[in-house]
Structure formats: structure tokens, C-alpha cells
Amino acid sequence: HFSARVLGVLGIVSFGFLLFTLATSNPFLRLIPAAVDGSDLNPLLQDFGLIVHPPMLYMGYVGFAVPFAFAIAALLDRDASKPDEVARWLRWTRPWTNVAWGFLTIGIALGSWWAYYELGWGGYWFWDPVENASFMPWLVGTALIHSLAATEKRGVFKSWTLLLAILAFSLSLLGTFLVRSGVLTS
């Protein structure tokens, strides 16, 4: 019953992404004028760290969809506030949160390492909007991990845990939109 709601929420999220992709993208558009040999990749971006960095960030962002789905399903379920139900959805949410946070950590670390040695900014972090777009879900994910532990062990912060699970995924979406839409430039 509860897992069906979780899968339903994930299905709605996936369907939303499908609709967005269909509405905004056309893989059959032609480039005018056509690039004879292609435009090649910027030499700064031809690096091993950047082969791994974007997929790690992506897996971290997408991984937060599962705790989000559990939180929304818990809000929709009347029995979700019972101690047994809370313990169950916390037990299922925690591994997904840890994995998503781990991927996001690796992605941020690789991006910082690349920026340090390739761009020579003189540091690992420059407070660039692109960096902060991945840092905000990471901070909320860190708070979510600790809130999950407190809720699991002492039964406190239930509402806070739900809010953090929703915020982690929402900030992942917002950060992706801001960085990839061209609203913010780095």
C-alpha cells in the first residue's frame, strides 16, 4: 500500500520529466549552418575528472527523488504518523539518502579538484553560482541524513525530516534549472 504510493510519486515525477523533455526538446532540429567537422569540445573540458563529475552530480540529484517520493507518500498516507509506519519509511529512505548524498559529494569534490588544477582559481571553491547550485542540495542532504538519524533513534524531527527530503530534491531541480537554462552564468 505505502510502496505503491511511493512508486506512484516516482511515476508522476518521471512523467513530468518526460513531458518537459517532449515539450522543450527536438532532437531532429537541424543546426544552421551545419557544422562540417563539428565544433569539438572545449579543451578545458577534455579531462578525466569531467568525464566522471557530471554523472556523479546527476546520480546525486536523481537519487534525492526517492526520499522525496517517500516523503510525499508519507504525507498522503494517514497511517504514516504511526510509530511503526514512521520506522518503516525511515528505514527505506535512509539508504537512498546516503547513496544520493555520496554521489553528490563525489561529484562536487571532482568538480572542485578540476577547477583547482585546470582553471587555477587559487582554491577549491570559488562560490560560483554553478558550484552553489550543487552545494545547496548537498547541505540539505547532510541535514536530512542527521534528521533521519534523530527521527529513527529518538522519534523527533518527523516533520522536519519530511521537509528536508522534499527540499533536497526541490533544490536539485532548481539548481539544475538555474545552471542549465542559462539564467545563471559561470
Residue ranges and their predicted role:
Residues 1-186:
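Polytopic transmembrane helical bundles with strong interfacial aromatic enrichment
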